[in-house]
Amino acid sequence: MPSTDHGDERPGPHSPQDSAPSDDGTPTIEFRDVVKRFGDHTVLDGLNFTVGRGERVTLIGPSGSGKTTILRLLMTLEDLTEGFILVDGEPLTHELRNGRRVELPPKRKKQMTRRIGMVFQQFNLFPNMTVVQNITEAPVNVLGMDKASARDKALGLLRQVGLEEKADQHPSRLSGGQQQRVAIARALAMDPEILLLDEVTSALDPELVDDVLNVLRDVAESTDITMLIVTHEMQFARDVSHRVMMFDGGRIVEDGHPEEIFTDPKNERTKTFLRAIL
């Protein structure tokens, strides 16, 4: 399903459309006829959609509708059953060669996924490393950044997420919300072109959720990173998204501007889902 044309809508003063994505003609993310099966169970059923450069798109829908699977396919944490995924017009895991669908070699896939960062439900910080070491580990060992530069960058990111004073502490000394903010800084340290957010507040105590969402709002407002977001925080989705896609049964049943989806949904499944959670 292509990106929705929002026509002559007039976004409000705090609308994400104030920082609308650029459009150079090549989608940052493209799913073409994507199918994902686990055994006999089809999780994604012939999925087609694009995400433009700098666009922030939130995926909503009931559990089991395929939202997290989309993120995991982009990170190559799951194998694609059928179809193609493209990043900046380049194949992520498979390409057509002489009319045949051929899997790319692991080295090529690894190079492609360096463009993508992901923040998971569970923060999974290394317990034996300090906060700043958790953030510098990948830039030093994957990108080849020197340790001093990596530390300077990490401290800047910790400042951005409000945790600079925790730099030399271990994760066990931090609350769940603080650990998730470190995980966000860790993902940003790799300078991703695309940031995937998978229910990043679902494992947190309710009083810690706002701090994490405020950090993500700041990231959305201050960067041009393309973001694909899975969340049940509907106000957050409304605040930061350029588009919202509603999933059910591994298919997109509605795709539109946040105000359209949340105030005047057209699909009955969308209406039922939103009535249940709002």
List where the protein language model places each region.
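ABC-family P-loop ATPase nucleotide-binding domain
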Residues: 1-35
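C-terminal boundary and immediately downstream tail of ABC-type ATPase nucleotide-binding domains
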Residues: 2, 247, 259-278
